[in-house]
Amino acid sequence: LTNVSVPGSYPIAVMPGLLRQAAVLLVTLADRPAFRATVPSKVQTYMAIGRPILASLNGEGARLVQEAGAGLATPAEDAAALAQALLQLYRLAPEERARLGANGRRYFETHFERSRLVDRLLGHFRLFVDSHRSEQ
């Protein structure tokens, strides 16, 4: 393949720039029970970057990609399904791939952006404190 790049290891500071050069970003996890309950940090990173995601994983990570409309998710370790999904993304118009990336970015901003997470956490703490005050 001449249009696939695996850039290797780089300092974290340069990663956003490298990731933004990609048309599609790949995240994979092995098919293990423990991995079904986890969301790889790459999923959140890729959403923040605003690029379509091609995910080969099961469970929460796959559900998140699908729920966000941020790309395509295939079962972990299913090479045929991964190849089909890659072709499907390749055949999309650039505008459609951009839409998938934008969906992921919006989902990230709504669900994972730090200041919003802090605000939600503080809201939960306030509810907890208020509910215990009313019990006294």
Language-model segments: residues:
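Nucleotide-activated donor-binding/catalytic signature segment of Leloir-type glycosyltransferases, i.e.
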Residues: L1-G17
